[in-house]
C-alpha cells in the first residue's frame, strides 16, 4: 500500500511531463521511503531502475548493464560492456523517440568506487543525450555525499538538475493513514514510536491492534521528530 507523498509525486510528474533531457535528485536518510516513492512514480513508465551496492566499480557496471538490456533487449544475455560510456552509448542508440526514466538508486555506493562516474554523466547530459527524452533520477541516502558531491557548486552535475527532493519522515496526518481505523490515541502512539519513518510504518498491520503491532516493530535506531 502506497501512502501519502502527494506533493513529491506531483513534483516528479511535472518533471517527467517536460520534453527533453532532465535530471532530478532525491535524497534523505535511510528507511525514509525514497525507493518506494520512486517505484510508485515509475510504475507506469519505461524505466531502467538500478540500485547500486558496495560491490566495486566493475560489478556495478555489470549489474547496471543488465538492467539496461532488460529494458531495451529483454532476454538478450550475450552482450557485455567494458565501460560506463559504452552502456550510455547503447542507451543513446536505442532510446529512439521513447521517453525513458533512468534511475540510479544509492548512487554514492557506485560513485565512491568510480571517481569518473559523475563527470561522465555530466558529459552525456550536456553533449550526447541533450536531444533525448531521458529523465534521470539520482537517489542516495548518504546525505553528505549527495549534498557535497551531487548538489554543491563543486559537483560536475551542478546546474544540470531540474529539481530536487529531500525526503523527510511522514508527519502525523500522513502517518495516521497507515492505520485509518485506529483511535486518535493509538494513531498518536504509532507516530510516536515510529517517528514517521516509512520503513517502520510499513511494518504495521492495520488489521492488528496497537499492542500486537508494537511487538512486531523492532526499531534498531532512535527516531527523531
Ranges and model annotations:
Residues 34:
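Conserved lysine of the Walker
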Residues 71-93:
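Short glycine-rich substrate-engagement loop in P-loop NTPases that contacts/grips substrate
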Amino acid at each position: 500500500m502506497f501512502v501519502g507523498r502527494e506533493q513529491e509525486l506531483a513534483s516528479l510528474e511535472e518533471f517527467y511531463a517536460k520534453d527533453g533531457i532532465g535530471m532530478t535528485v532525491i535524497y534523505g536518510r535511510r528507511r525514509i521511503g525514497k525507493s518506494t516513492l520512486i517505484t510508485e512514480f515509475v510504475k507506469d513508465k519505461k524505466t531502467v531502475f538500478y540500485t547500486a551496492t558496495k560491490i566495486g566499480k566493475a560489478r556495478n557496471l555489470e549489474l547496471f548493464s543488465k538492467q539496461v538490456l532488460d529494458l531495451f533487449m529483454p532476454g538478450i544475455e550475450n552482450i557485455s560492456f567494458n565501460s560506463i560510456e559504452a552502456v550510455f552509448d547503447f542507451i543513446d542508440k536505442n532510446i529512439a523517440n521513447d521517453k525513458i526514466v533512468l534511475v540510479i538508486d544509492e548512487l554514492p555506493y557506485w560513485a565512491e568506487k568510480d571517481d569518473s562516474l559523475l563527470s561522465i554523466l555530466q558529459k552525456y547530459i550536456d553533449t550526447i543525450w541533450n536531444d533525448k527524452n531521458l529523465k534521470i533520477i539520482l537517489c542516495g541516502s548518504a546525505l553528505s555525499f549527495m549534498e557535497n558531491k551531487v548538489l554543491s557548486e563543486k559537483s560536475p552535475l551542478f546546474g544540470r538538475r531540474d529539481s530536487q527532493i529531500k525526503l523527510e519522515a511522514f508527519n502525523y496526518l500522513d502517518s495516521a493513514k497507515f492505520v485509518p481505523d485506529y483511535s486518535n490515541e493509538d494513531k498518536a502512539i504509532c507516530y510516536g514510536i515510529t517517528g514517521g519513518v516509512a520503513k517502520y510504518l510499513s511494518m504495521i498491520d492495520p488489521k492488528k491492534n496497537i499492542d500486537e503491532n508494537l511487538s512486531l516493530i523492532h526499531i534498531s535506531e532512535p527516531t527523531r521528530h
